[in-house]
């Protein structure tokens, strides 16, 4: 069994990379792949780069070249639920694009033509994530909808627009739906794990810079426990 872990930025992958044993590095199309053993499992860690195009391209390379059995996306996000705080963690049950609009042709808002309106995370991976989340102290962990777009959510008007389209939205970020779409095309199970570095629209650029490392650690800690559970 091989487990792939994807993070967009150095801050989101460095904790995991440092723990990989027998590590080998490969660069393909400027995407950084690290293979080896993590908590007893065979893993491929990918630093994808930021944004949907980078995420889709690198995920396609990952799935075609390395053939993982599972994909876990880790990293930071902006929170949308009023009950969530910086550092809290969101586990995806579904993922959607928040910047796709082909409603003029009868599609749902966020739906890419020919694709499902939302991408469903693997139920087994979600359950494993939820079980391991029970061991986490001092932060909230919720399961829900994550939305993706090629913009950082610091514009209050944009935040309110996205919230109006997806009232149940838990978090927004810049890669997950692209990763989910590619995994769906390849029929590879996935789950998204995101810790909040900011609350969307509330001085989010300042919060992001201040709390990115904390968010990355919280997300990585849960990913490590998921990897261990999958290996059992």
From Swiss-Prot:
The active site is at residues 12, 198. Substrate binds at residues 78, 153, 174-175. GO terms for cellular component: cytosol. It catalyses: S-adenosyl-L-homocysteine + H2O = S-(5-deoxy-D-ribos-5-yl)-L-homocysteine + adenine; S-methyl-5'-thioadenosine + H2O = 5-(methylsulfanyl)-D-ribose + adenine; 5'-deoxyadenosine + H2O = 5-deoxy-D-ribose + adenine. One of its GO terms (biological process) is L-methionine salvage from methylthioadenosine. One of its GO terms (molecular function) is adenosylhomocysteine nucleosidase activity. It comes from the Bacteria. Keywords: Amino-acid biosynthesis, Hydrolase, Methionine biosynthesis. Its EC number is 3.2.2.9. Catalyzes the irreversible cleavage of the glycosidic bond in both 5'-methylthioadenosine (MTA) and S-adenosylhomocysteine (SAH/AdoHcy) to adenine and the corresponding thioribose, 5'-methylthioribose and S-ribosylhomocysteine, respectively. Also cleaves 5'-deoxyadenosine, a toxic by-product of radical S-adenosylmethionine (SAM) enzymes, into 5-deoxyribose and adenine. Belongs to the PNP/UDP phosphorylase family. MtnN subfamily. This is 5'-methylthioadenosine/S-adenosylhomocysteine nucleosidase. It comes from Geobacillus sp. (strain WCH70). The gene is mtnN.
């Amino acid at each position: 069994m091989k487990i792939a872990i994807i993070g967009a930025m150095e801050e989101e992958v460095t904790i995991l990379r440092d723990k990989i044993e027998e590590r080998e590095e490969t660069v393909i199309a400027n995407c950084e792949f690290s293979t080896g053993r993590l908590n007893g499992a065979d893993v491929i860690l990918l630093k994808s780069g930021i944004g949907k195009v980078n995420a889709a391209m690198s995920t396609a390379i990952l799935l075609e070249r390395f053939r993982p059995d599972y994909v876990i996306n880790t990293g930071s996000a902006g929170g949308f639920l009023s009950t969530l705080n910086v550092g809290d963690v969101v586990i995806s049950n579904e993922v959607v694009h928040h910047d796709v609009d082909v409603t003029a042709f009868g599609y749902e808002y966020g739906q890419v033509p020919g694709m499902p309106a939302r991408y469903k995370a693997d139920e087994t991976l979600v359950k494993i994530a939820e079980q391991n989340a029970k061991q986490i102290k001092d932060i909230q962990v919720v399961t829900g909808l994550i939305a993706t777009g090629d913009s950082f959510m610091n514009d209050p008007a944009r935040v309110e627009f996205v919230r109006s389209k997806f009232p149940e939205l838990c978090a927004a970020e810049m890669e997950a739906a692209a990763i989910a779409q590619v995994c769906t095309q390849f029929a590879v199970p996935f789950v998204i794990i995101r810790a909040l570095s900011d609350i969307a629209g509330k001085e989010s650029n300042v919060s992001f810079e201040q709390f990115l490392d904390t968010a990355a650690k919280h997300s990585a800690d849960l990913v490590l426990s998921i990897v261990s559970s999958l290996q059992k």
